[in-house]
């Protein structure tokens, strides 16, 4: 596809996230346009399509994927629908940007990894947007530069003001902690081998039955320690912080003032961020711009992604499965996942 041709995209699922992506493609990022809109709510799909020139509503998600005026697909549908929809994209040979999770369990995610590998192409990108955030990319660069020395410990905090109706304790692991799982793998370039979830005193203001906050402890292949506080009913603000402690210094992101490092003078700020869109809007924009470019240039190499792929989705699912088991038992749980080199082309 030439640079002067627009990539034609179907967006499946136009709730808060999907509608944001439609607006992002239509009004913020060049090189692509939304041609098909799909949602389980026909009224919602029609509402978004009416705001998106040149788009039309397709009622059936699989018809939307197969449509002739669709070159690539964005999935912002509920997690339980992802497996069949991603497989349909592979069958159609169409690149897909799938919001997390890739699927809702490790076995089906691994099956998708194998199905993509059998095609000999990289068609699946998973929407772990933090990898595209300026602060996270700064932190990754700092780690890789060696300025902090060998990383030893990572401290994370993930706080939300509130959660939607129906949110439960396991979803804190699968829907919230999953981001800390991915950034740990991204920053340290190694797999997580065990998880333990600690249940501190629960927030009395949280919806009944939710164990919130939770503290996760990860161990990585090389023995590094990562701890993550996840508190999703703070009632205050959206906060995501990560601190890496190395042999030669430390660095922290997420304080609304940019990266702070203890190898040089830092600063402090007192602002708060109301939600994920304000905190990670730039990351989403960068993620989509890079994905669109990768899809448009992928025919020559067979690589249609620029970011986390199917393997990363599988790894996250495997770690979260261990996390849910630990939440139930209180014990350290070893992550059950296959070695990457056991799947040719993964």
Curated annotation (Swiss-Prot):
Gene3D superfamilies: Dihydrodipicolinate Reductase, domain 2 (3.30.360.10), NAD(P)-binding Rossmann-like Domain (3.40.50.720). It comes from the Bacteria. Pfam families: GFO_IDH_MocA (PF01408), GFO_IDH_MocA_C (PF02894). It catalyses: myo-inositol + NAD(+) = scyllo-inosose + NADH + H(+). GO terms for molecular function: inositol 2-dehydrogenase (NAD+) activity; nucleotide binding. Its EC number is 1.1.1.18. Keywords: NAD, Oxidoreductase. It is an enzyme of class 1 (oxidoreductase). Homotetramer. Belongs to the Gfo/Idh/MocA family. This is Inositol 2-dehydrogenase.
């Amino acid at each position: 596809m030439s640079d002067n041709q627009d990539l034609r995209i179907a967006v499946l699922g136009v709730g808060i996230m999907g509608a944001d992506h439609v607006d992002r493609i239509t009004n913020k990022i060049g090189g692509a346009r939304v041609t098909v809109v799909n949602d389980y709510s026909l009224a919602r799909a029609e509402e978004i399509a009416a705001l998106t020139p040149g788009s039309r509503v397709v009622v059936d998600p699989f018809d939307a994927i197969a449509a002739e005026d669709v070159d690539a697909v964005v999935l912002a549908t509920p997690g339980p629908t992802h497996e069949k929809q991603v497989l349909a994209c592979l069958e159609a040979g169409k690149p897909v940007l799938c919001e997390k999770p890739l699927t809702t369990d490790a076995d089906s995610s691994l099956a998708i990894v194998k199905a993509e590998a059998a095609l000999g192409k990289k068609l699946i990108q998973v929407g772990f947007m933090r990898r595209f955030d300026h602060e996270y990319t700064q932190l990754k660069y700092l780690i890789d530069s060696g300025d902090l020395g060998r990383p030893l410990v990572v401290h994370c905090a993930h706080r939300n003001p509130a959660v939607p109706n129906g949110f439960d304790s396991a979803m804190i692991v699968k829907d919230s902690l999953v981001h800390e799982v991915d950034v740990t793998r991204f920053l340290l370039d190694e797999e997580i081998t065990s998880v333990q979830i600690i249940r501190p005193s629960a927030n009395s203001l949280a919806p009944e039955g939710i164990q919130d906050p939770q503290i996760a402890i990860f161990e990585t292949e090389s023995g590094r320690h990562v701890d993550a506080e996840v508190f999703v009913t703070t009632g205050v603000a959206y906060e995501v912080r990560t601190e890496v402690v190395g042999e030669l210094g430390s660095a922290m992101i997420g304080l609304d003032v940019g990266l702070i490092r203890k190898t040089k003078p830092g600063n402090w700020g007192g602002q708060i961020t109301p939600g994920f869109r304000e905190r990670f809007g730039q990351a989403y924009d960068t993620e989509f711009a890079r994905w669109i470019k990768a899809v448009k240039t992928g025919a020559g190499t067979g690589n249609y992604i620029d970011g986390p792929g199917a393997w990363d989705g599988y790894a996250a699912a495997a770690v979260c499965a261990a996390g849910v088991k630990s939440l139930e038992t209180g014990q350290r749980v070893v992550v059950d996942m296959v070695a990457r080199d056991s799947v040719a082309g993964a």
